[in-house]
Structure formats: C-alpha cells, structure tokens
Amino acid sequence: MAYDKFNILTSSAVPLPIENVDTDQIIPARFLKATKREGFGDNLFRDWRYNGDDTPKTDFVLNNPTYSGKILVGGKNFGSGSSREHAAWAVYDYGFRAVVSSFFADIFKGNCLNIGVLPVQVSPEFSDKIFAAIEADPKTELEINLPEQTITLLATGEKESFDINGYKKNNMINGFDDIDYLQNIKEEIVSFADKLPY
C-alpha cells in the first residue's frame, strides 16, 4: 500500500508532554480486532479522549480546538509497551504525519516508518523548547525536512538534525512501502536472477 510522499512538512503541532506513553494508551487492546488499517484514528488515545459514556473529556489535548496540526509532539519513551502496529495505524489514521519525541520505543518507531509516519527523535533540550514554544503560542509551527533530516522551530529558527535509516528515508520520500519498493526495482531483480548460474 503506497502512502503520501514525505518531503518537507510544515505544520503546527499537538503537544502531549507525557512520558512513557505506551501502545495500550495509544490504542486500547479492545479495538485491535479489525484487520484493515482504516478507522483506528477514531480510537486514538481512546481512554484519554472519552469518558465511560463516550462523551469527550474536554481537558484532553485532542479535544481542545486550540491545538491542531499534522505533527504530534510526545514525551520521552513514546510508543513503549507491547508490539502492536495498530498503534501506528491509529496515529496515521487520525491525521498525524510525524511524531516528535526525545526517545521512541524501537518497535513503534519501526511500525511508524512502515506506514508513512515519520518518527523524529530530538534531544531532550530541543523537545523542551518545542513544548515551551507551543505553550506560549499554540499556532507555533515546526518544519520537518526529510531530505535534509532536520527539524526547525520556526518561531526561533532553531534547528536540529535527526537520524533515519536510509532505506526507510528513501521509501518515505517516494511514498513507498516495502512491496512498492520491490515492485519499483522489479527489472533489476529479474536481471540479477537471470544471471545466476542455477
């Protein structure tokens, strides 16, 4: 399944300054029965967003119209806990195209990269600056430049580099998943196979 190409993303951000957000908090286990990737955004942070009677919790950031954007800024150790790709699906389906944190759980990070959500790991100091800027002005924008592997706090011009696997970077820039990538180099694969002596 192809995804939107990711080049440069400029957007305001939704702040979630909570450490150790695990995958069960991102998408509770009772919503994992579906096998299609669509529809999980409705239950992103379900138990934090809604009361037991399904009314919105007005004090949760996703229910606050002051904050919006395609970037989610999370606290340290974002995406820990059990391995469930549904957590990444929920983030994507809600409309986020990037998640910023000072540390990601490896499996969640990999799941995000597989479906077109860019995990941007920054230093704790830069993370604090982002949260402070958004608190001062909720319309604060971030610019994430994937080709250059930089994230910029546009309010101040401060910039930081981030790491990403080269293969995953190429896939995101081209809007590929793993299958798309293989199909794109099909001729090279066939040519290589034809040259094998067996």
Can you describe what each PLM-predicted range is?
Residues M1-Y198:
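Cytosolic catalytic domains that perform sulfur/thiol-centered chemistry
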